[in-house]
Structures are given as structure tokens and as C-alpha cells.
């Protein structure tokens, strides 16, 4: 399992993934939720609330946050962003700011890597930009208690 996310962290990630300008479309969200086997019982709500409710329901049921990490990996697949690399870069930076609070970063190869845990907002905002993939070890599932 990956590190457990708090409700605030899940909400922040939902806001990023469902953002109007740089986030995913409603169709993309539907498809990725299906691919990740995350229940989608929130049709008709805003993208952000829909994602938060779906993530929270699945995470509570599974007693872990792996569904959120799976969704992020699927959403950030490089092939999805070939026609909009600026939006991808912005979204990856914002996602990594939240993940830095858990000592993780999603690198350009779409793999979670371990970084030093950020404990402040300023660290969380700086850490993803400066963590070198060559210095970090790949994050492994089932290594956190």
C-alpha cells in the first residue's frame, strides 16, 4: 500500500484533477474511474466533488488510498497528454506538491518515487521541482504500514 492520504489531501488532489481549465474532462473521469474499478455513484455533481466522493468511498471501503494513486497514474499516462503538454506539466507539478507531503513524487516516466517528506507548504511547493529522479528510489507498493 502507498501512504494513507488524509481527506484534505484527497480533496486537494480531486480539485487538481477536476480543475476546469487544466483538469480532466467529465468523460475522461468516467473512463479512468472505470479502468481503476472505482465506483462512480456521483454523476451530475461537479467534477471535483464527484472525484472526492468516489475516492473517499473506495478508500474507506478498502481501508487504504491505493485507488487515488491508481487513478493518478492512469490520468497522467504520457499518451493522454501528447497534444497538451503544458496542461500536463502544470497538473503534474500540482499533484506532486500534494504528494510531497507523503514523501512521494510522480516522475516524468509516470512512476511514483520516494522523496524527502515535506512538512510545510513552502517545502511542498519546492520539493517536487528540485527532487532529482536519479537520486530518488522508486516507490514500492506494500512497503508502508
Go through each PLM region and give its residues.
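Charged interaction/catalytic cores of defense and host-pathogen modules
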Residues: 1-119
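Charged alpha-helical initiation segments
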Residues: 105-145
Amino acid at each position: 500500500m502507498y501512504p494513507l492520504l488524509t481527506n484534505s489531501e484527497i480533496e486537494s488532489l480531486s480539485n487538481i484533477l477536476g480543475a476546469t481549465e487544466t483538469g480532466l474532462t467529465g468523460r475522461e473521469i468516467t473512463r479512468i474511474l472505470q479502468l481503476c474499478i472505482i465506483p462512480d455513484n456521483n454523476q451530475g455533481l461537479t467534477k471535483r466533488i464527484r472525484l472526492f466522493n468516489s475516492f473517499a468511498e473506495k478508500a474507506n471501503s478498502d481501508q487504504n488510498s491505493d485507488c487515488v494513486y491508481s487513478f493518478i497514474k492512469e490520468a497522467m499516462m504520457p499518451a493522454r497528454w501528447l497534444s497538451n503538454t503544458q496542461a500536463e506539466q502544470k497538473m503534474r507539478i500540482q499533484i506532486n506538491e500534494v504528494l510531497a507531503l507523503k514523501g512521494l513524487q510522480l516522475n516524468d516516466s509516470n512512476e511514483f518515487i520516494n522523496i524527502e517528506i515535506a512538512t510545510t507548504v513552502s517545502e511542498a511547493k519546492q520539493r517536487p521541482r528540485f527532487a532529482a529522479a536519479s537520486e530518488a528510489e522508486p516507490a514500492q507498493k506494500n512497503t508502508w504500514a
